[in-house]
């Protein structure tokens, strides 16, 4: 009978926290309203009115897209913090595993690939429809490059590597550029 290998709990929780930050950033970005082709001519009047939620910086605010853009940027940055900690904690506790490496890459794909790309699309609502198509294409290429980068990292990296050097641009750095733009966007708007 094959023995089941235990999962390192604390590093895995940090990796999952990274994943949750990315997922929540996508949810927050999805609440940013972008004008449609009809909305340029006719404003939408049938908006659902939910009970009033007090303004808290980590709560989605449907009426304030700027706050949602900033929250999305902050969640991506928070995901970077969890991503920086999970590998270090696993190595310090001598609990590194292939499972952890794969889970980390999947979490990174969501937090540093899909979430920044979706944020990029939602931050460009006033572009004409021809330009919005280009934004979607650029965002799609960004996600594909993130997936390829993470797959390459998983294939090239061995257990003995100490991860002290890196070939190419790390995905958190690319995501930091987009998240940083979102945070600067807030500073310029206020």
Locations of regions flagged by a protein language model:
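A feature for the membrane-embedded catalytic helix bundles of lipid/isoprenoid biosynthetic enzymes
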Residues: 5-11, 105-190
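Short juxtamembrane and helix-loop transition motifs at transmembrane-helix boundaries
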Residues: 1-5, 65-71, 94-100, 130-137
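Basic, gly/Ser/Thr/Pro-rich low-complexity segments located predominantly at protein N termini
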Residues: 16, 23, 27-30, 92, ...
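Topogenic membrane-insertion module of multi-pass membrane proteins
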Residues: 1-84
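Membrane-water interface at transmembrane helix exits
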Residues: 27-31, 86, 91, 120-124, ...
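Acidic (Asp/Glu-rich) catalytic motifs at the cytosolic membrane interface
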Residues: 75-118, 152-155
